[in-house]
């Protein structure tokens, strides 16, 4: 009996190790394609790994909880509160806190937590004003949004992607895979900007990605571009 239990445990351990090794190899392949492959090779490979219940964690921010079509200055999608209670897809933004909505103007949707945002908009031919207070938001994406983003990849833009300077060894534990790497890019002034990114992938038993999240040095990136937090 004890021999049977020992054998069962050993087989399970081998299965977990094999599964972890496969997931690790998948992430390493994605990184190799990002560094050395074409836009389509990377996008198609990633798209083939996206599970039905895929969740992309894109960080948190302070804002209103909607996505905007910057070209048309219209509301593209309402995601969270407080925007859910005040905005509708298709609303045309006219001004925000007195700042006219036009190309070149930075609209203060984001800012201090709890700060009031007064939005003048046009809906179905009628002009109106709505007031909201900024709240903590989580930026997420599902399978549809991820596949839509991957479909926009093209070889011309791919040439200008940020470059990976160095990668730490990928670490896998069962269905979870962790990786970190340093990237560099060139800003508008021609200066080199560097930052580190840490990523976490979770795979299902079929080898597809159900979760992909990352954090990076946003503050350091901003500082290298000449921005700083107010004291």
Predicted region positions:
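Conserved PDZ fold ligand-binding element
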Residues: 83-103
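Sec-dependent signal peptide recognition
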Residues: 2-8
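A beta-strand edge to alpha-helix "cap/lid" segment located at domain peripheries
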Residues: 21-22, 147-231
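Extracytoplasmic
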Residues: 70-71, 114-116, 174
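PDZ-domain C-terminal substructure recognizer with occasional recognition of PDZ-binding tails
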Residues: 107-144
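PDZ/PDZ-like peptide-tail recognition elements
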Residues: 21-76, 82, 107-110, 133, ...
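Hydrophobic h-region of N-terminal signal peptides that target proteins for export
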Residues: 10-18
